[in-house]
Amino acid sequence: PQLILSLCWGFAVLIPWAAIEGNIKSVVLLFCWLATVFWTFGFDTVYALADKKFDLEIGVNSSAVHLASNTKFTVQICYLLTSVFLAFCALINQLNWIFWPIWLITAFLMQKDTLKIFPESKQSIREIGNHFKKQSIYGGFILLGFVISS
């Protein structure tokens, strides 16, 4: 389910771009789409941890179930790739220096927050919810960085 959601949310990048530009032929668009897909997969995998017990009971092969002991590593890689693809977008668009501290702090916090929900003994509904909420805040900071640095 998390992969499908990630691909669908990726259309939130593709559709407006196509409507404004009239095409989807852009390396920046590709990087934005990839950042969206990886970020969504990462944070929705964390969100799926809250339901992992129920997914196992009813046979749902969520990413939290499928990845098992590789979940932490996968989420960290997803967040790393998200940060890298966003950096490529910023470089290509020659954003000014204001973006980079925002990007660096956000990339660091995304990784740091992952440690708060692993190992599995730390996975309370509250911690998972906080992680999910913080991801939306980080997204807001990244957006702000793009806007004020353009």
Please name every model-derived segment.
Residues 1-150:
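Multi-pass alpha-helical membrane architecture of UbiA-family
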